Design a protein with these regions (language model features):
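Beta-rich, blade/repeat-based domains predominating
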Residues: 52-68, 97-116, 141-159, 190-212, ...
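Structural signal for beta-propeller blades
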Residues: 78-81, 123-125, 166-169, 221-223, ...
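Short loop/turn segments that connect beta-strands within beta-propeller blades
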Residues: 84-88, 129-134, 172-176, 227-232, ...
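A short helix->beta-strand "capping" segment at the edge of beta-propeller domains
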Residues: 37-55
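Blade-level signature of beta-propeller repeat domains, shared across WD40, Kelch, NHL, RCC1
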Residues: 296-332
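Hydrophobic alpha-helical segments and helix pairs
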Residues: 127-183
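Beta-propeller domains
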Residues: 72-92
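Conserved beta-strand positions in repeat-built beta-propeller and related beta-rich domains
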Residues: 64-65, 70-77, 116-122, 158-164, ...
C-alpha cells in the first residue's frame, strides 16, 4: 500500500515536466534520482501475454497483494491472464466456457480474496474466487450498456461505470455476500452528459471510505466527483472537477494523487488534488517507449502496471508495462 493521502490546499499547482521512463538505464522520475525510493527499481519491465491472439486485446488489470500476483482481462474472449512480478509472461488463468457469453473482461479489482470484473457489452458483473478461478457470482444489468470499470470500497460495496448508459451500477455488500441480487442504478444525468455512440464514463476510484467517487468521462475529457449516500442513491451529488482536459481511461489513487491513463498519447498523467477534490493540477506525466494505446493502471509493490490495449494497431504480442513507481514527492 502507498502512503496515506496527502491533503492539499485549494491553491493550484504549477504544471511539471513530462517524465520518460526508459526501458533500461536510470529512470528520470521527478526528484527520484534514478531509483525507486531505495527499492532498486530503475527500469521498466515488460510482460507479454502468451498466447497473444488478434482481436483479444488486453484491457483491465488488478493486483492481489496476498498472492503477489496480478490479473489482466481481455475483450475478445474474456480470458483473464495471471502472472507474478517475477515472471515475464502472463498466462491464461480463467477461460470462460464457449457457452458463456463472457467475451469481455474489462475493468477489474481484487478485494478480500475475490476478483471483480466488469463485463463490457455483456452487461454482467462477475465475481471470481481468486485462488481457484471459480465463478462465485454473476450480476446482470441488462443489455445496451458497456460496463467499463469498477471500484470496491472499504465497506465492501462495488460501483461500476457504464460507458453507454448514463448511470453507475451499485452492488451492496449484502448482495455480494449472498451472491445474488439486482444491481442498483444510480443516475448520473443531467450533471454528466452522455453522447450516443461514444465512450462516456470510464475509469473510477473511491475516496473517503467510499463516500466519494471520482470518475472520468473519456469523450468529454472531464473528471467528476460523486458524493454517495449508499443508503439513498437518489441523494448523490455530482460536481465537475476543475482539471486539465484528459481523455482518460483508467484511474488510480496513489499517495493522495490521481493518476489518469490516456491511450493517445500513451501516458500516465499524475494530478495533485485539492483538499476537497474540487481541483486537480498536473504534477508530472509518465511515459515509456513500451507504452502504446494504454488503457489502465494498477499499483503493485514498487511498480505501476500499465496495460497496453493498443486498439488502434493491435500489434502482437500484447504487453503490460511495469513502470517504476518512484519515491513520493513533497506537496506544498
Amino acid at each position: 500500500m502507498g502512503r496515506a493521502p496527502v491533503e492539499l490546499t485549494d491553491r493550484p499547482e504549477a504544471p511539471r515536466d513530462r517524465t520518460l521512463c526508459p526501458a533500461a538505464g536510470p529512470v528520470g522520475l521527478a526528484r527520484a534520482s534514478g531509483s525507486d525510493g531505495g527499492h532498486g527499481i530503475s527500469a521498466t519491465k515488460v510482460f507479454t501475454l502468451d498466447p497473444s491472439t488478434a482481436g483479444n486485446n488486453p484491457e483491465g488489470v488488478a493486483w492481489d497483494s496476498r498472492s503477489q500476483t496480478f490479473f489482466v482481462g481481455t475483450v475478445g474472449t474474456g480470458t483473464i491472464y495471471r502472472a507474478s512480478l517475477r515472471d515475464t509472461t502472463l498466462r491464461p488463468f480463467i477461460t470462460p466456457p464457449a457457452a458463456d457469453p463472457a467475451d469481455s473482461a474489462v475493468g477489474m479489482k481484487v478485494s478480500r480474496g475475490k476478483l471483480y470484473v466488469a463485463g463490457g457489452t455483456t452487461g454482467s458483473i462477475y465475481v471470481y474466487d481468486i485462488r481457484t478461478g471459480a465463478l462465485m457470482a454473476r450480476f446482470e444489468t441488462g443489455s445496451g450498456g458497456f460496463l467499463n470499470d469498477l471500484v470496491v470500497t472499504e465497506e465492501g460495496d462495488v460501483y461500476v461505470t457504464d460507458s453507454f448508459r448514463p448511470m453507475l451500477w451499485h452492488l451492496t455488500r449484502a448482495m455480494i455476500k449472498a451472491g445474488t441480487g439486482t444491481p442498483q442504478a444510480i443516475n448520473v444525468g443531467p450533471e454528466i452528459a452522455y453522447t450516443t455512440g461514444q465512450f462516456n464514463l470510464n475509469g473510477i476510484v473511491a475516496r473517503r471510505d467510499g463516500r466519494e467517487l471520482i470518475v472520468v468521462s473519456t469523450f468529454s475529457e472531464s473528471l467528476f466527483r460523486i458524493d454517495i449516500d449508499r443508503h439513498n442513491s437518489a441523494a448523490r451529488k455530482i460536481t465537475k472537477i476543475d482539471a486539465p482536459a484528459l481523455a482518460g481511461d483508467g484511474l488510480l489513487i496513489d499517495r493522495g494523487q490521481l493518476l489518469v491513463v490516456t491511450g493517445d498519447p500513451a501516458e500516465v498523467t499524475v494530478l495533485n488534488l485539492s483538499r476537497h477534490d474540487s481541483r486537480a493540477r498536473v504534477s508530472k506525466v509518465l511515459t515509456d517507449s513500451s507504452m502504446h494505446g494504454s488503457s489502465t493502471i494498477a499499483h503493485a509493490e514498487n511498480r505501476y502496471l500499465v496495460v497496453n490495449a493498443d486498439f488502434t494497431h493491435s500489434a502482437l504480442p500484447f504487453t503490460v508495462s511495469a513502470l517504476p513507481r518512484g519515491r513520493s514527492e513533497s506537496h506544498h
